[in-house]
Amino acid sequence: MTLSPYLQEVAKRRTFAIISHPDAGKTTITEKVLLFGQAIQTAGTVKGRGSNQHAKSDWMEMEKQRGISITTSVMQFPYHDCLVNLLDTPGHEDFSEDTYRTLTAVDCCLMVIDAAKGVEDRTRKLMEVTRLRDTPILTFMNKLDRDIRDPMELLDEVENELKIGCAPITWPIGCGKLFKGVYHLYKDETYLYQSGKGHTIQEVRIVKGLNNPDLDAAVGEDLAQQLRDELELVKGASNEFDKELFLAGEITPVFFGTALGNFGVDHMLDGLVEWAPAPMPRQTDTRTVQASEDKFTGFVFKIQANMDPKHRDRVAFMRVVSGKYEKGMKLRQVRTAKDVVISDALTFMAGDRSHVEEAYPGDILGLHNHGTIQIGDTFTQGEMMKFTGIPNFAPELFRRIRLKDPLKQKQLLKGLVQLSEEGAVQVFRPISNNDLIVGAVGVLQFDVVVSRLKSEYNVEAVYESVNVATARWVECADAKKFEEFKRKNESQLALDGGDNLAYIATSMVNLRLAQERYPDVQFHQTREH
């Protein structure tokens, strides 16, 4: 049975994001993934080095004029017979709620772990987010060219801390200065390590069979024997790879390598295109939308603000769920029930980013937006429904915001509410006083808000510390019990930007006590947009 051209395009797509702790090697992996996909011939351009290369595309020129850096937000590259969309998840200083929300727009994630350190804090948090939709996870144990922890120990740690079974696909032979390569458990092949630097991919020598004398000759008898002994253990103690369990988010295939040495990344990409799902169905408030449907649907998961005060426009990122986008198409913005013609959407295509006029499920479109689009907005060809599963996340950092000029309270509130609708920050107004508390997931969000309040609303604001550790949205089916809860906890309740009631806890202990005291009240860590 031959698929229609449209369904062939859908079947080719793989959309994924990378989750890792800062410094586990995400940027390097991103570079090398693009290198193996031939999207960039000189690794390093991800960081924007070699500016002469950037002048080729007029799309970049437009970006420079507008001061929006959206180049690396979505990268598309071909690999084997697939088209892969890699969505960037800002890590270091620019970590924000957007990082969490991006994970709601992909069909699969690659978890990168520094094999010298194991599971770290940020990885735990990001894994919790992928659990909301049981997203399939592939794992890459990175930095094998350094001294690493015992590989079995690393697998145990992933299983115990992240509650996901590990199925090793490749297994390392030595590490650090003694790193010799990896053995592929399912192909019965050993790939010998030669360091490739920058954009050179070395020809890898392959030894067939675990008991091949060539293996002993290549890695030394001791390491070859150690490998055989370890594999006995591994086969007895770890999970076998099972595609169904992988797609259900219950086990993760594990690959070992060194991104810096250009080694092992291709094994992982082979697994990604072979096993990761093509664009998945998605739930709305009325029905499930299949990627194979011919009518266009999509949802906005992120809005990138412009830091250049001369240009107020922002780019809304929309994940295509079904149907084909064509330039000049008329789409309905469901929340406002207005039809809009989308003629200048940015498409992120391999290589030439300017002239592509179509996009398919799994692809990401950038929509120009002057404040009319919100996070979670659904676009359709007329059907009135809203995609679910694009939440607000409970902030982890809080500050009180105060005006330099007290007469501008109204503008401040308006600005904060609009910024919260856009997803830049969350705002809480305590019921018992006139404070305004701003909540964020990353520190950068606070700076962005102050500079945008000044440039867009002409309001000068400063922050003060506030005694808030965390927030939870609260609801209760029993109205009488809810009233009692509200009466007794008035000093710790606040309304967010959308007038939803939240409990503001001064410490995690305080939150736990409240949860124990009021078992009928639900305390939610996320809230639908």
UniProtKB/Swiss-Prot annotation:
The cross-references to Gene3D superfamilies, in alphabetical order and at most eight, read: P-loop containing nucleotide triphosphate hydrolases, Peptide chain release factor 3, domain III
- Which GO MF term does the entry hold, naming one? GTP binding
Q: What is this protein called?
A: Peptide chain release factor 3
Q: Which PROSITE patterns match?
A: G_TR_1, G_TR_2
Asked if Acetylation is a keyword of the record, the answer is: no
Disulfide-bond pairs as recorded: none
User: What are the tr-type G domain coordinates in residue numbering?
Assistant: 11-280
Keywords (alphabetical) are: Cytoplasm, GTP-binding, Nucleotide-binding, Protein biosynthesis
Per the similarity annotation, which family is this? Answer: Belongs to the TRAFAC class translation factor GTPase superfamily. Classic translation factor GTPase family. PrfC subfamily.
What are the GO cellular component annotations? cytosol
Instruction: Note whether Disulfide bond occurs among the keywords.
Output: no
Q: Which CDD domains match?
A: RF3, RF3_II, RF3_III
* Cell compartment(s), UniProt: Cytoplasm
Give the record's GO biological process terms.
Answer: regulation of translational termination
Q: Which residues bind GTP?
A: 20-27, 88-92, 142-145
The record's InterPro entries line, in alphabetical order, gives: EF-G-like_DII, EFG_III/V, G_TR_CS, P-loop_NTPase, PrfC, RF3_C, RF3_dom_3_sf, RF3_GTP-bd
Its biological function? Increases the formation of ribosomal termination complexes and stimulates activities of RF-1 and RF-2. It binds guanine nucleotides and has strong preference for UGA stop codons. It may interact directly with the ribosome. The stimulation of RF-1 and RF-2 is significantly reduced by GTP and GDP, but not by GMP.
